[in-house]
């Protein structure tokens, strides 16, 4: 099943469906800034915020990383994972230059299956192969408790809705 979002007002197809609240989070393996593999299981017992976006080198994506870095200080027992197709070197450069130490950046560059599993793979248009903008919140037991596939890729996600489910 595919979904439609928009990029600069134009429809874009996204393969599969984003996980819905109440479903079990799919396992994944992504790449950390030191090029090591990181799995969902490594965050067992913690709540996880997956901030998924096309590239850290765009203004809106960078803004979302900055905002979630700030919000990460307000929520206990929670890790914020910022996930994009950027190489770990670019992610590290950005976070280092910005002084962002409260989020963990992860890359899909060796494991594009993540995009399919989480229903964020852009299937057509100029961003084909990248991730659509989305937020998925997962509880300590790896159950999805919130998800948002942002309708317009060039707009920021609903931070307050994601934060509200973590403070509930």
Curated annotation (Swiss-Prot):
GO terms for biological process: cellular response to oxidative stress. Its main location: periplasm. The active site is at 61 (cysteine sulfenic acid (-soh) intermediate). CDD domains: PRX_Atyp2cys (cd03014). Its EC number is 1.11.1.24. Residues 19-168 form the Thioredoxin domain. It comes from the Bacteria. One of its GO terms (cellular component) is cytosol. Disulfide bonds join 61-95. The keyword Cell wall biogenesis/degradation does not apply. Keywords: Antioxidant, Cytoplasm, Disulfide bond, Oxidoreductase, Periplasm, Peroxidase, Redox-active center. Transmembrane segments: none annotated. It is found in: Periplasm; Cytoplasm. Belongs to the peroxiredoxin family. Tpx subfamily. Thiol-specific peroxidase that catalyzes the reduction of hydrogen peroxide and organic hydroperoxides to water and alcohols, respectively. Plays a role in cell protection against oxidative stress by detoxifying peroxides. Has a preference for alkyl hydroperoxides and acts as a lipid peroxidase to inhibit bacterial membrane oxidation. Acts as a principal antioxidant during anaerobic growth. This is Thiol peroxidase. It comes from Escherichia coli (strain K12).
